[in-house]
Amino acid sequence: MRKSLFIFLLLTVVIISPLTQVEADETIENYNRSIQFSWTGSATTVEILGEWNWDERISMIENNGVWIGELNLSEGIYCYKFIVDEEFIFDPSNPLRGYCGDIENSIIRVKDSTRPIFEIDLQGQELVVTFIPGKDGAGPAGTPTDLSDSNWDSESLQWTLDISNFEDGKHTLRLEINDTNGNIAYDELVPFWVGEQAEFSWEDSLIYMILTDRFVNGNTSNDPISTGAAQGADWQGGDLEGVTQMIESGYFSEMGVNVLWLTPFNTAANGTGKASDGVHDVSSFHGYWPVEPRQVDPRLGTEEQLKSMVNAAHDAGIRVMMDYVVNHVHEDHTYYQNNPEWFNQGCICGTSTCDWTENRLDCQFTSYMPDVNWKNRNASEQFIEDALWWLEEFDLDGARIDAVKHVDDLAITNLVDRISQRFETAGTDYYLKGETAMGWVGHELADNQEQYETINRYMGENGLDGQADFVLYHAVVDNVFTTGNENYQHLDYWTSRSQDQYEQGSIMVPFVGSHDVPRIISRADTGTGDAWNQWSEDGLPGQPGNDESYQAVLQAYGWLLTTPGAPMIYYGDEYGEFGGADPDNRHSFRESTNWNERERSLQENISKLGQLRLQSDALRRGTYESLYNSPDVLVFERATEKSSALVVLNRGESNDSISLNLANYTNAFGSAIILEGLLTVPSNSVSVLIRENNSSNESEIIEEPEIIIGCTDINATNYDVNAEEDDGNCTYEDDTINDNVNNNIENNTTNLTNITIDQNNTLDNSNDDNSSQEECEEAGGIWNGDWEECNEEDNQICIIEDENGLIIDCEDYNQKRTFMPKAVIVKSILLISVILASIVLFVISRQKDGV
C-alpha cells in the first residue's frame, strides 16, 4: 500500500548506523538517535523552526545542494516548517500535517530514544526480525514469545523464523520484549498470510457489503427493542453470528466473494432522530451514529463474536474490512460529552445558507451529529488511535472510510500513515477505501474533471488505496442499466475513463448498488412504484414481476464482475432484492427458501460470474480493452501476459454476429461462441470466453489475408490468376490490340456477365476424377488454366468466372478460392477498353491531319 517504513526511518529515528552483519559491541558503540531533516534545492539560507522552540531558528548546512539539519528531540509530536530564503514552507519529503494554533504545519512524531525497536523483513518463507537497541546499547533480555521457534544471531541481533510449516491463512505476530537494562521495546505487529492468500492483491477482491442489522439474525437473544421508528427505519435483528453462519455455510465462497465490508461495529445511539425530511423518526440500526469509541454494539454481538467472525472469514480465505466514521459522532458520544472543543459548531449541511461543498469541512449532517474538528490535535490523535485499536484488536484487514471529503486532508494522510506503519511491517497491504460522493455531470470528459479531481485528491502514494467510483456509477447505472437513456457505447466510454482518469495505482471500487441509493432492480422496474420513494405512505416499489428487470440486473452484474478494480456487491442484489430510497433499500436479507425462480436464477448466474472472476487472472488483473461496441452490444477484453478473457454483453432483442479475428477462446459463461473468427452473440445475454497461455498470439489470432495486386484481365499476356486487385499494368500482344479495343467497346458487358454459377457447387470436388474438361467448359470455365498453387504434375484446373468472381477449382487438392468480384473485372476491362480506344482514335485523327 505505502512504503511508510522509509518515512518512519527518515523522520523518527533517522540516522542509524548499519545494524546487520556487524559485531554487537560495534553496533552499541556507534548507535545514534538524533533526528535529521533535509531539504534539496538552491537557496541562500535554509532554516528549521519548530514547536520544540518557536523562538529559535535552526540553520541547516548545505552540501552539494542538500541542506541538512540535526536535532536531539524528546519523545512527542512536533509542528515545524522550513524557512527557505525567509519563505515558510512545508517539508516536501514529509506528507504528515498538523495544526499548531490555527496554522497548518508539517509534523514529526519522535520516539523515546532509550527504548529499543524492531525492524521486520519477510522474504518468501523466512521472517527476519532485527533488534535495534535504545541509546544505551543494551541487548534483548530474551526472545519475544511469538519468535520462540526462531534462530537467534547475536552478531547481527537478528531472529530468523521459518514460516514454511505455518498453516495456510492469516497470522499476526506481536513482538514484545525488554532490553537487559529494563527498557521496554516499542511493540511491533507482524501480520502476514501463508499459502495461496500470500499472493493476494486487492485488485483480486470481490467485495460484499453487509449492513449487519439487515443481514442474518444468528442469535435472537440479542435482538434489539423497538425504538418506534418509521417503517423500515428500526432495528431488525441481524448480527455478527448471522454473518459467521453465512461464512461457514460457504455462501460467500460459492459466490467468489473474498472480502467482506461490514457497517460500523461501534455501539450506536439509542432511540431515534429525525430523518432529513424533519418528519419521520429513524434509528441508528446502520451504525453511523456512534456513541462509544471502542465498544461493539451489543445489538450486533460481543467482542468475542466479532473475533470469531473474523477468524471464520480468514479460515475461508476471506478478508474483513471495517467501516470507520471519521466525520462525526452522535451527540450522546463520550467524546462530545467530555470534550466539546474537539468538534466544530457549524451549520446544517444542505440548508439554504449551508452549501454541502462550501461548508463541507465544518457543517453538520444533522443537528444531533457533531462534526469532528481534525485541526484539534487531541481529537485527531484520539480518532486515529481508535481506528488502530479496532484493526488490531479484531485482526481486521482494511477499512472503508466514511464521508472522506467532509474532513480535512490531514485526517486522511495521517490516518493512512499510522495504519501503514502499524500493520504493513511485513509487506501485507491493508486496503483503505474512501467514500467521496461525487456525480456525473455530462457527456464531455472536461465537464467531469472536477469530479475526478476531487476523488483523486485523497488517493495516491500517501493517501487512500482506492475509492468508490461514483462517477462511473452515475454515468452508467443512472443512464444505461436502469433507464436505458444511454447505450453500450456510452457504457464502454465511461468504463474506459475509469482506467485513465484516476490516480495511477489506485484500486477503485465500481458498484451498481449500495445502502445510499435505491435498489438497482427497482430502478430498472417501472411497474411497481417510484424507486426513489422512501416511505410507505408514498408507495414503495414492490417485487418485480417481469423478466426484463432481472435481465437488466444480470447485464449490470455481468459488466460489474468483469470490469477492472475491486467490484462490490451490495447484500441482496445478487438475487434481486427490491426497494426504494433509504431506508427502503435496506430490507432484511431473505433466505434462499424465500426466493422465486427469477431470483434463484439471478443469484446462480451472479455466483457463477463471481467464481469465474476468482479463478481467472485475466478478469482480476487484466487490462481493459474495448474490441467492439454498438448501441446494444459491448465486447471487451481483459488480458494479462498469460491469459485473456472476452466479455460479451448484449442487451438487445436480437442475436448478433461480429467478426473479431480471434481464436482459441473457450466459453466459460453464457452461450456466445467464436468460430473461424466470427463471434455469435445471443440476444439478452452475458457471456465470458477464456483463453489461456497468451504467450503465442501469432498462432491464435487469425490474420487478415494480404491483398494480391496484379493484372486481372484474362486476355492480357501478363494475366495473374492470383491477383485480387488490378494494378493497371496489363500488357497485350500488338496484333490483338485493335481487336480487343473493338470487342471491348462493342461488348462492354461481356458474355461472362450472363454466367450465374453457385461458387460452392460449380464442380464436384470429391477427387474421384468426375471433374472433366467437358464439365468445366459447360460451366463456362477455362480448362487447365495456370495457377501456381496447383503446379503438381497431372493437376487439372478449371477457372470459372461468375457473378461472385473468379473460382479456381484445384481438383487434385480439393481447393477452391474466390479472387476478384466480377464487377471489378468488368470495370477494369471497360477502363482498359476506353483507354485503348482513345489511343486508336487519337492516332487515326493525327494521321488525317497529316501529322
Model regions and ranges:
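C-terminal membrane-anchoring or membrane-association module
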Residues: 836-851
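Primarily marks secretory-pathway-exposed extracellular/lumenal segments that are disulfide-
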Residues: 20-24, 699-817, 833
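Active-site-proximal helices and loops of the catalytic beta/alpha 8
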Residues: 139-141, 318, 386-388, 392-397, ...
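Loop/helix patches that line or flank the sugar-binding groove of alpha-linked glycan CAZymes
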Residues: 218-235, 493, 502-663, 681-682, ...
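Substrate-binding/active-site clefts of carbohydrate-active enzymes
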Residues: 201, 205, 215-394, 410-425, ...
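Aromatic-rich carbohydrate-binding modules that target alpha-glucans
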Residues: 28-77, 85-111, 142-159
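C-terminal beta-strand-rich structural cap/linker in extracellular carbohydrate-active enzymes
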Residues: 79-80, 676-700
